[in-house]
């Protein structure tokens, strides 16, 4: 080992270790190692191809003997070493290179260490195939720093005079039960994957693997699967909402960036950030970051904010109106991106979504994984200054939601659309008063809003004036002003008038 320790340690520098502390762990093991015992005393395994001269007692391992053993193994397999005599294996007329004797040889009875076998696979599987050496990545458990990882590195450096046979080395912990105990038959705490498939579906097991930080020991139990099933349903319901609202949408006619509404651009800017985060995580083999980021996006940005706000546009605006098609464009791009991004983890669910959703010309509709990965939609992105304003809108909305909850508890209102809100905002939020009439009310999901500037944010909730529109449920003083549609607001009356008459 002393003859190539420095080279082996230097080879560690050219490898990307995941986690990063793997490099120091490997280097320290190599530096502490003085010898490498590659022989084992057993009657099975790969023989050590060395002969001994009975006369002089010296070992014999020459190109000639190696060729003879190689031909033998190719013809009869390695067991022939134990079934034949040395004279039967060696070439006819062979003589000892040390003493010149032509008879009296015996073969080594020890076998090679199994780690030497596995550590040589890079030569057998990659060296002989053009362009495949070194491997992109080696993946194994934490114990393999002393096993396969190290033996592969040492054989490559010591025998071939090269660097490590892998560009990246990724390690994982062990699967343990919900209490952190090792799984044993005696404890009865093992988890059968087939039972998980039957109870929850294969994708939930994939989601468990993709949600776990595998660099440490990973817990596995039915309770964990139950909790994860909620995350799975959230993703599935998010996709269902998008699909339900895209049945009449042609993705080949996306709304142009210049025409898209600001809220929809906000959603796509959030999506862009998700795309960057997801692919950075994939590049770093941090699959749990992918799963948690997608779940947070579905819960925080979409379900709790964006989806609630756009429902009125999707359900009540004209089918071909810019406002509705703008929302549909954003929904389509969100669904398309999430399906492509999450397919490596939720392979079956994403394929199911892919088969159900509309597609642009050029997409391979057979399977999502046959398509290119998504890139950020920079053409729809808002500027950092614009996103900062949306952060303020979200903060105001949180305050308004709190006031609405209190008003509901006080029986002042029932649904939020029964409310009129008076907002006092600080100077930094004065832009809210400049928003298009009705736009802020839509963002807050109330019927009417009044805004004035003051020293700090305050919210007052009262019952909205006017009559309830029977189509959009908003309380407006304009309801009934359109002849023939006395129970509708002007917006809804115009949409209803435009609908085809069914005879």
Q: In which residue ranges do the predicted regions lie?
A:
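Residue patterns forming the tRNA-binding/recognition surfaces of aminoacyl-tRNA synthetases
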Residues: 1-66, 84-86, 148, 181, ...
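Cys/His-rich finger/ribbon microdomains and the adjacent scaffold used
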Residues: 1-133, 140, 257-274, 356, ...
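Glycine- and acidic
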Residues: 11-24, 130-142, 189-194, 213-225, ...
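Beta-sheet entry/capping signal
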Residues: 36, 48-50, 57-59, 104, ...
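Acidic, turn-prone loop/beta-hairpin segments
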Residues: 105, 249-279, 307-403, 407-427, ...
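Glycine-rich, acidic and aromatic/proline-enriched surface loops and short helix-turn segments
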Residues: 118-121, 202, 241, 300-308
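Alpha-helical support elements that line or immediately flank enzyme active sites
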Residues: 151-160, 294, 341
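Residue-level signal for inorganic ion chemistry
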Residues: 172-173, 235, 302, 347, ...
